[in-house]
From Swiss-Prot:
GO terms for cellular component: core mediator complex; mediator complex. It is found in: Nucleus. GO terms for biological process: negative regulation of transcription by RNA polymerase II; positive regulation of transcription elongation by RNA polymerase II; positive regulation of transcription initiation by RNA polymerase II; RNA polymerase II preinitiation complex assembly. It comes from the Eukaryota. Component of the Mediator complex, a coactivator involved in the regulated transcription of nearly all RNA polymerase II-dependent genes. Mediator functions as a bridge to convey information from gene-specific regulatory proteins to the basal RNA polymerase II transcription machinery. Mediator is recruited to promoters by direct interactions with regulatory proteins and serves as a scaffold for the assembly of a functional preinitiation complex with RNA polymerase II and the general transcription factors. Pfam families: Med1. InterPro entries: Mediator_Med1. Residues 141-170 are annotated as: Disordered. This is Mediator of RNA polymerase II transcription subunit 1. Component of the Mediator complex. Its main location: nucleus. The keyword Mitochondrion does not apply. Keywords: Activator, Nucleus, Transcription, Transcription regulation. The gene is MED1.
Amino acid sequence: MADQYVEVLGDLIGLLKDYKPGTITIENITKLCQSMGLESFIDELDNDISRLSTASKIIVIDIDYNKTQSTVQDVKLVLASNFDNFDYSNEQLEEAGDKQSNILLNSLTNYDSLKQFHHNLEFLYLLDTYSSVESDNQISSGNNLGSGNGTNGSSLTNKTDKKSVSSGNGLDSKLNEGKLNLFKYFRELKKYINTFFKESCDNRFKVVANVDNRFGLYIYETHGYSMRSRPLAKVYFERAKVPQQRFYEYIYSSETGSWINENSENYSVGVNLILEVNFDDTDEDVFWFPKEFVPTDLFIDEKDQLTSRKVSDVLCHAFYELGSSKKQTIELMNDFTTDLIQIRRFNINNDNLDLIADILNWTIWYRTVLRPIYLKLVSSISDDDDQHIRADIANTKDEFTVENTNPEIMKGPTNKNASFMQRNSMSLQRRRRSSNKAKRPSMSEAVVFKDEGLQQFSLHEIMADTTTEPDQKPDNLNISNNSESFIGQQELMEGSNIINDDKMDIDEEAINDDDSDSQSGEEGNIPVLLVNEDHVSFKGLGSCSFYDDKDKWAKFVEDLFNVFS
């Protein structure tokens, strides 16, 4: 019960610090540091300047505060470890030649509250908590806390050195026996990811450190990049929900073309590396991600799918009239093969770093192709139809999944402003051919057949045979009185079905229905817009795929909207 009380109290304090961070005064900064468990004290350097020194196991921060002007004058960060090359500058400002690139100083001078500084302090404390240092009691002479602070710096350092890992940050030293310094790894991770993008993605993306005076690695598209560009995603560390979870040091190797762990002792416990897609969710405009695109253990904070209408929900309805001037009617075909989930954060620990490019490419595909088409379709739906759609979703348990082929579910509602036509079946349904009793033969069954002297067939013979459905009898099948011959021929039929069992086939019956439907309507020939999670096609414009060049995506959407306008 006490643990639950402390946990809830910690959450409340976190909310207060986030939503009511307080004004920037030396007293509030001191209280903020103390609330996080950092040792802090204030020294009076002269009549005007007070120096707040705060420290934990590794970090030592000096903040010089001008009491007369009520402003922060300088902030310095040093690390009590052998690695003291941690970058706390705004890379974009540094590249632009701005001398004020110190993000700790900027977060205390460029804002009205402590919110930005609180974020940066939490990030540093997180790295401090889960980092291992080779020597806690070594601070190089270059790591002095500045002029006029030699005595104070050494006393604070001595206090920090006496703190054990368990007492300093709540992490059991027996659990974290790894040798990973997260400060060093975070500094080098930018270089590794940029090399990965250069060699695996044709330099399509680039990583910039510490944007908008916040710690983190921000990922941009290389083409058209500028300081005003909006990042696609950001990479940062976060406490793991499973305290015993290990985080290993994975680096990108140009020799192998993959992410590798060179030393199994370089790990930390209780921390995750997060990739967060930069997307401003609203009630009707959210970021959707295909559920089966990456392993589900990467998903963090998956939201309720039914809170908003999905892309595939809208596309399930057959016909819409788009464009008030031309009254263009098109047929929409839903060919989605997976559910879309509302999620923006992914756990890219360890070898999952290899999936960064796939997630980013999907993000661009969604923003460039699926999202504009989705918003265009939503804008064409009247309020009455919107209520019908939401009612259909609410009354159906397994709506719009690959397995659901209920014709009633796929029917579109009546629209007084748009042309709707009901479909008898879902267009281009993907299904698997059934094997005998929906059961695949095992290896042991093949051995039994051989022992009993039953006829066997090679893979080549099976592939060469004409495919037949289980419920159809081929015309050329001669059933003789010879049971062995009959069994062998029957095996040939079943074997052929087994081989084709994994093939994703187009339902020919559904296609025939679609062809007949497409010829109906006022004009007698209604163009078809087919959309799934990685492919879009439209009659007369061709198609574009997730695997095509990005320029083709934009050109296809532009041409498609010209048809709608």
